[in-house]
């Protein structure tokens, strides 16, 4: 009887370990999809001010462009 209980406990532990490994693999896969990869870095947005805008720019501000990438914006 004691042998049966030990075998049952071992089988239960093996099943729980396999289930935990599968969950960890899914969590790792989801985390990898959420992180920005090298292919995401090529996507950027650029904004320029039209020449006929209502407010005139000073001479030093003419030709400036805003270049944004994933939360970081730079003036060019």
Swiss-Prot record:
Signal peptide: 1-22
Cysteine-cysteine disulfides: 68-73
GO CC annotations, alphabetized: extracellular matrix; extracellular space
Family the entry assigns: Belongs to the alpha-defensin family. Theta subfamily.
Function: BTD-7 has antimicrobial activity against the Gram-negative bacterium E.coli ML35, the Gram-positive bacterium S.aureus 502a, and the fungus C.albicans 16820.
Post-translational modification as stated in the protein's UniProt record: Forms a cyclic peptide with subunit A (BTD-7). An additional intersubunit disulfide bond is formed.
Propeptide span(s): 23-64, 74-76
Cyclopeptide (Cys-Arg) (interchain with R-65 in subunit A) crosslink residues: 73
GO BP field: antibacterial humoral response; antimicrobial humoral immune response mediated by antimicrobial peptide; cellular response to lipopolysaccharide; defense response to fungus; defense response to Gram-negative bacterium; defense response to Gram-positive bacterium; disruption of plasma membrane integrity in another organism; innate immune response in mucosa
Organism: Papio anubis
Biased segments, Low complexity type: 30-44
Protein name: Theta defensin subunit D
Residues in cross-link Cyclopeptide (Arg-Cys) (interchain with C-73 in subunit A): 65
Pfam families in the record: Defensin_propep (PF00879)
Keywords, comma-separated and alphabetical: Antibiotic, Antimicrobial, Defensin, Disulfide bond, Fungicide, Signal
Quaternary structure (record): BTD-7 is a cyclic heterodimer composed of subunits A and D; disulfide-linked.
Annotated region described as Disordered, given as residue ranges: 25-47
Sections of the chain in a coiled coil: none
């Amino acid at each position: 009887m004691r042998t049966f209980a030990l075998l049952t406990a071992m089988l239960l532990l093996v099943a729980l370990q396999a289930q935990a490994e599968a969950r960890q693999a899914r969590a790792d896969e989801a985390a990898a999809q959420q992180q920005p990869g090298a292919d995401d870095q090529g996507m950027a947005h650029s904004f320029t001010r039209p020449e006929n805008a209502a407010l005139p720019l000073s001479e030093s501000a003419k030709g400036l462009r805003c270049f944004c990438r994933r939360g970081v914006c730079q003036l060019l």
